[in-house]
């Protein structure tokens, strides 16, 4: 764990994501693996100065990342998930977006949706759904992607209400 000393949220997430992928593969308990892993990640993060906020991760996203990581421990889905849960700006953006999507007349159940932040350098194509103070939400074939407000000016509108952003 010395490698985690003074780690950035992204460095922490990359290492913790690989460990979590391997724990998922081993599946050490008949019951309670998810709760045990959540407690382990929270404590590991705390020990190295990171707040791991898994409340911003939907069940669908966790299941998807877990399946990908079980099939390939080096798959980046779990690291991306943990980056969203650990990097403060990403976690705040997801929390605000989830509150927005989960309230009002157009509210939808969120736990069955994959909701994530856009990765730096990623191209996002989707239908614009919502804007909060921190991000804009685009519905893509793979789920809902939160894009930082500063990057929304790069959106190029296309036919059918689609927008394409190069971040």
Describe the role of every protein-language-model region.
Residues 136-141:
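SH3/SH3-like beta-barrel fold
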